[in-house]
Amino acid sequence: MNPETLKFIEASIKTIPDYPKPGILFRDITSLIENAEAFKATIDLLAEHYRDQGITKIVGTEARGFIFGAPVAFAMGLGFVPVRKPGKLPRAVIEESYALEYGTDTLQLHTDAIVPGDKVLVVDDLLATGGTVDATVKLIRRAGGEVADAAFIISLPSLGGDARLTAAGIKVVSLVELAGE
């Protein structure tokens, strides 16, 4: 990946201190997607990186995974599959629950969206603890798909998501790695 493009993408992401609570450095991707040149560079970089790797579907998790996953799928001429919270998908679904800091959450996938033999790229905006993507990967595998990689715009390695996904056999690709929470 082009180092100059990666620096441009990183410079387009604003950091908001003490949001949503004191001590947190919030990584704001809206500043990136508001900038047409930076947004296009991000999509083009991911699409080009994965173009010749046999990917058959792009999966994005609710909600910001849609922002990046759908245009990457379009740029690659592939279908986009949304993974959503309960009650948002109209057809038959499979679901996977996962732990949060305080409680659990659940994600759903249409039962016919991924078929055996699909080689899937998971795209999301940010990798923190990895819980959401780990649940997404479990859904894809239960549906018979193979997860090629999980690609993120931002990774926060100190929160353990990179290690968690790698331990689960998932290759992690992040355009920008940032310190902090």
Swiss-Prot record:
Query: What pathway is it annotated to?
Result: Purine metabolism; AMP biosynthesis via salvage pathway; AMP from adenine: step 1/1
Known catalytic reactions: AMP + diphosphate = 5-phospho-alpha-D-ribose 1-diphosphate + adenine
Q: Which Gene Ontology CC terms are recorded?
A: cytosol
Query: What's a single GO MF annotation on this record?
Result: adenine phosphoribosyltransferase activity
The source's domain of life comes to Bacteria
* Major localisation: cytoplasm
Q: Where does the signal sequence lie?
A: none
Name the family the entry cites: Belongs to the purine/pyrimidine phosphoribosyltransferase family.
Summary of subunit composition and partner proteins: Homodimer.
For this entry, the protein name equals Adenine phosphoribosyltransferase
Q: Which organism is it from?
A: Aeromonas salmonicida (strain A449)
The gene designation is apt
